[in-house]
């Protein structure tokens, strides 16, 4: 049975790997602390308890070269899907992870998301607000995400859900902890969107192949007259 695919994407240090481990129910993805990411290539994770595969990505970094490296890694994975026999790698749902403690979502992060997933123009997106330790701030963070995407109307239509999540127990102080929360809701939301995502993945992949054929055809047509002119007496 073909598994669907969920792409997990976002800035370095937002907690993508911790989120993946929480969804899998075991420590599989390498985790770290601070703003430096721990994933240096795309990794695929499966579990018998999940109907979908999870694709972890390289986090977006502030520097241009590292940012482009992360974007190009996703684009390369996506283009591999167009090869014969690789269609089961198509992306069906995207989890865009945002740090709930930062209180900001910069347009650049959304732009990086758009560039990296440009091939998947109609695939549904769930914005996952990680590290949502403060319950009172969750509503503010949801509004923050809504406002940030409002300025990116072309991509905003793909955002289907915004979910605050606590992926691992977090110590607030000596006597208080933030318990894991929102993981079941995230899995349920993903499963609900998957029928739409499966159709979107097939459509986007077909459109990519069609556009590539057109580009190749234009390239050949454009080349022949030049070749003819060069060899004509």
What are these regions (language model features)?
Residues 49, 72-158:
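Conserved C-terminal guanine-recognition region of P-loop GTPase G domains, centered on the G4
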Residues 34-35, 67-74:
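Short glycine-rich substrate-engagement loop in P-loop NTPases that contacts/grips substrate
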Residues 123, 133-199:
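Canonical P-loop GTPase G-domain recognition
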Residues 27, 62-63, 102-105, 136-137, ...:
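Conserved protein kinase catalytic core
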Residues 1-64:
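Conserved G1/Walker A P-loop phosphate-binding module
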Residues 217-233:
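Membrane-inserting effector segments that mediate pore formation, membrane fusion
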Residues 212-216:
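Regulatory, non-catalytic segments
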Residues 196-211:
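Short, flexible loop/turn segments with low-complexity composition
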């Amino acid at each position: 049975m073909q598994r669907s695919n969920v792409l997990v994407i976002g800035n370095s240090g937002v907690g993508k790997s911790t989120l993946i481990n929480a969804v899998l129910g075991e420590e599989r993805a390498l985790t770290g602390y601070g703003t430096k990411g721990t994933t240096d290539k795309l990794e695929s994770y499966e579990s018998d308890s999940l109907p979908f595969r999870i694709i972890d990505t390289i986090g977006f970094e502030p520097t241009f070269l590292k940012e482009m490296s992360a974007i190009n890694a996703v684009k390369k994975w996506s283009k591999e899907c167009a090869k014969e026999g690789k269609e089961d790698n198509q992306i069906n749902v995207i989890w865009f992870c945002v740090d709930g403690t930062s209180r900001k979502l910069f347009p650049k992060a959304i732009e990086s998301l758009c560039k990296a997933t440009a091939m998947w123009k109609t695939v549904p997106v769930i914005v996952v607000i990680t590290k949502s330790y403060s319950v009172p701030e969750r509503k503010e963070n949801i509004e923050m995400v809504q406002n940030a995407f409002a300025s990116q109307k072309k991509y905003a239509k793909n955002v289907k859900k915004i979910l605050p999540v606590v992926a691992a127990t977090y110590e607030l102080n000596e006597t208080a902890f933030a318990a894991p929360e929102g993981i079941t809701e995230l899995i349920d939301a993903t499963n609900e969107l998957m029928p739409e995502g499966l159709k979107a993945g097939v459509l986007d992949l077909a459109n990519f192949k069609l556009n590539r054929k057109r580009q190749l055809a234009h390239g050949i047509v454009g080349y022949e007259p030049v070749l003819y002119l060069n060899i004509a007496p």
